Amino acid sequence: MVRVTPLWILMRWRSYVRILSEAIRAVIPEAEVYVVGGAANDRLTVKSDIDVLIVLPHKLGFSKTVDLHAEILEEAEKLKLPLYAPIELHIVSKEELKKYKQREKIIPINEI
């Protein structure tokens, strides 16, 4: 039996992102998906989470963002994303994407 440790979990971050990407495409086909933060900068620690940036054509209100977040995670669970996967979703507009590009490295999901 495999012992699930924080390091073991983080070593599998790419597989979690692939599952999550599939879930995002099922829920919002027009979304652009990127990895940001520690994973994008190759500086994960055992306390890291995997930051996934979901870019939509326009800004959503708070309520719609929360609903979309839940819908994506439900779809990801159906696709067997482990419940312990340390995923953090950031749902932003194309305009907000520009700010991310100015301040940090972002990697398109298809380059993972």
Regions found by a protein language model. Give the residues of each.
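Structural signature of the urease/amidohydrolase superfamily beta/alpha-barrel
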Residues: 51-52
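Catalytic core of pol beta-like nucleotidyltransferases
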Residues: 1-35, 40-47, 56-112
